[in-house]
Design a protein with these regions (language model features):
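A short, amphipathic beta-strand motif
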Residues: 5-13, 42, 80
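Residue-level detector of high-confidence beta-strand sites
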Residues: 20, 35-37, 47
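A glycine-anchored, Pro-Gly-centered beta-turn/N-cap motif
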Residues: 49-52, 74
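Structured interaction patches on ligand/partner-binding surfaces of diverse proteins
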Residues: 60-83
C-alpha cells in the first residue's frame, strides 16, 4: 500500500458503525469521482491520487455530511459521524 493512496474509514451514527450508508469521493472541484456503500461494520475504502478530496456521506434519515480530506501516498484514515 505504500505506493498507493488509500482513503478509508468508518461511518458512525450514535457512536456505532453504520452499515448501508453511501460515501462519495469528490475531487478538488467538487466533481463526483466514485461512490461505495459502507460494509456491515461501517467501513469504506477508496483508491485515489494524492491531493485534496471531499467525502460526502449519505445515510438514511440524516443530512449529507461533507468531510475534507488531504490524502498522501499511503493510508489516510477518516472517521465520519452522521446525525
Amino acid at each position: 500500500v505504500t505506493k498507493e493512496t488509500v482513503i478509508q474509514g468508518v461511518v458512525h451514527r450514535d457512536d456505532a458503525p453504520l452499515a448501508g450508508a453511501y460515501v462519495r469521493l469528490l475531487d478538488a472541484t467538487g466533481e463526483f469521482t466514485a461512490e461505495v456503500p459502507t460494509s456491515a461494520t461501517g467501513q469504506f475504502r477508496f483508491f485515489a491520487a494524492p491531493g485534496t478530496w471531499t467525502l460526502r456521506t449519505l445515510a438514511p434519515g440524516a443530512q449529507p455530511v461533507d468531510r475534507a480530506v488531504v490524502a498522501e501516498v499511503g493510508v489516510t484514515d477518516v472517521d465520519v459521524y452522521v446525525g
